[in-house]
A protein has these predicted regions:
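Short, motif-level signal for alpha-helix interfacial/capping segments enriched in acidic residues
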Residues: 10-12, 82, 87-91, 95
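Conserved beta-sheet core of the metallophosphoesterase superfamily
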Residues: 50, 88-152
Length: 166
C-alpha cells in the first residue's frame, strides 16, 4: 500500500499548506512546471519525488528530469507527463506514449485545471491535479492524494487553497 501525493505547476511554490496536505504520503509525483531545481530539491528533501519537466522548466531541471516518466507503483502502471490533455483530447505525443506504455493511471498537468476522468477507450484513470502554485490563471491552488493498494486506486482526496497574495 502506498499513499501518493500528486502535484503540478508549482512554479517555485512549496509552502506550508502544501506540505501539510502531503505530510502523510509515501511519495510525491510532480507533473511538471516545478519552477526551479531548488524547488525540486526542497520537495525531494520532504518526501521521495518522481517528477517530469514542464514547458517553462529550464535547463537545470531538464538535465535532472525527463518529459515522460513510466513506472509501476504497487500493481499499477503509471505514465506521467506535463502536457497530456485528457480523454478524447490527448496531446498527440502523450497519446503515442499511452499506446506504448498502456498505463492504468495517466498523470499530467499544464492546464492549471483539476480534472479526474476515467477513459474507457484506454482503460485508464486520467488525473490532472491542477496547479499547486500561485502563478497562472487558476483561482484556487489544488493537489491530489490517493492510495494505491496492489492494483486498486482508491481514497482520492483533493486539497484546495486560496492563492497567496504575495
Amino acid at each position: 500500500l502506498k499513499r501518493i501525493g500528486i502535484i503540478s505547476d508549482t512554479h517555485g511554490t512549496f509552502d506550508e499548506p502544501l506540505r501539510e496536505f502531503l505530510k502523510d504520503v509515501d511519495e510525491i509525483w510532480h507533473a511538471g512546471d516545478i519552477g526551479s531545481l531548488e524547488t525540486a530539491d526542497r520537495i525531494a528533501a520532504f518526501k521521495p519525488l518522481r517528477a517530469v519537466t514542464g514547458n517553462v522548466d529550464g535547463g537545470l531541471i531538464r538535465r535532472a528530469y525527463t518529459d515522460f516518466l513510466a513506472f509501476d507503483c504497487e500493481g499499477v502502471r503509471v505514465l506521467m507527463t506535463h502536457i497530456g490533455g485528457y480523454p478524447r483530447h490527448y496531446d498527440p505525443r502523450a497519446l503515442a506514449r499511452i499506446h506504448q506504455v498502456e498505463p492504468r493511471l495517466f498523470v499530467c498537468g499544464h492546464s492549471h485545471i483539476l480534472r479526474v476522468m476515467y477513459d474507457p477507450i484506454y482503460s485508464l484513470l486520467a488525473v490532472n491535479p491542477g496547479a499547486a502554485g500561485n502563478y497562472g490563471i487558476h483561482k484556487v491552488r489544488t493537489a491530489i492524494r490517493l492510495v494505491i493498494d496492489g492494483e486498486e486506486m482508491r481514497d482520492m482526496e483533493v486539497g484546495e487553497w486560496p492563492r497567496s497574495s504575495l
